């Protein structure tokens, strides 16, 4: 009897379980049949997605590459990298870079001795303590910034660093043809961008001169295209010269100051796309040997900012290179009430210009407190910003009192992937 009751109970339980399973199956089928009535979120249009992503911080973009292959391909594409550069965002303040080097080995010289360096980055002098980023082994005395990239020299080799992605690339060494034992040798690298073909190129000028007769100068020039499989290519140019500045690139043309074997001051131009050099006569009153001048961008044109008289009488000469290759001169006179902002004891070095047209000047020596001068050419206004806490170079791994280089990256965050 008990066995019969147990069998009946087991049968009823299985029956109820079967009915429950059937009911759940019917519900699933009904759900599948009504699936077309469910709300399906539409995909975000590509143009809207790009607009959203270009306004995000670079750290978010690096994480979002893991969302899908489509997002990864989009973020890594050259189109998106260029779009990201052009979008102005309040989340991207300009950044200041100070490079400390452990000894006075001029990075323009051909040397092979190891050295230590550290690159310090902060968004503004007021946030130096809170927003200081330290990058060991990066930077140099002669740095070039362009479209979010930093070019510097380490023992004769050109190095590129993207502070946004933290990617660094060291270009191969060049086998120069004019290396003469016993001569003085120097080299300088330039960074250019061709907006038509969207190509980045590094230009190297190597100079060999007699140590006894500096009037005898021979030079050779090399170009490296930043692309997969890139290599150094020699460019012929029959005008030997010695560069004295790192120059700047405007509209696909690199401009830099130099002098010839006859100690004639010239301006050298290099067309990034055609890879052709040209020479323009510099203003006769200027000298390439003077430290108190350099190229700036003024109104979309290259201009020489000559500030040798800024400390004494508050005067600045601005020489603008016009389309016809002629120079136009403007004399700027600082307001008398602002002359006290300039320290007469320490020479000033021109760093760069901001997107607002302010010329950035810094002392040529590490002083305490260290300060930055912002000179607004349009308003003829000078302001001084002090950095209360300069970095402790001993704490940062730099022994002794280092030399330093200073550069400005004005709201340019590049997510381009460097390939060579």
Curated annotation (Swiss-Prot):
Residues 38-87 form the F-box domain. Gene3D superfamilies: 1.20.1280.50. InterPro entries: F-box-assoc_dom_typ3 (IPR013187), F-box-assoc_interact_dom (IPR017451), F-box-like_dom_sf (IPR036047), F-box_dom (IPR001810). It comes from the Eukaryota. PROSITE patterns: FBOX. This is F-box protein At5g62510. The lineage of its organism: Eukaryota, Viridiplantae, Streptophyta, Embryophyta, Tracheophyta.
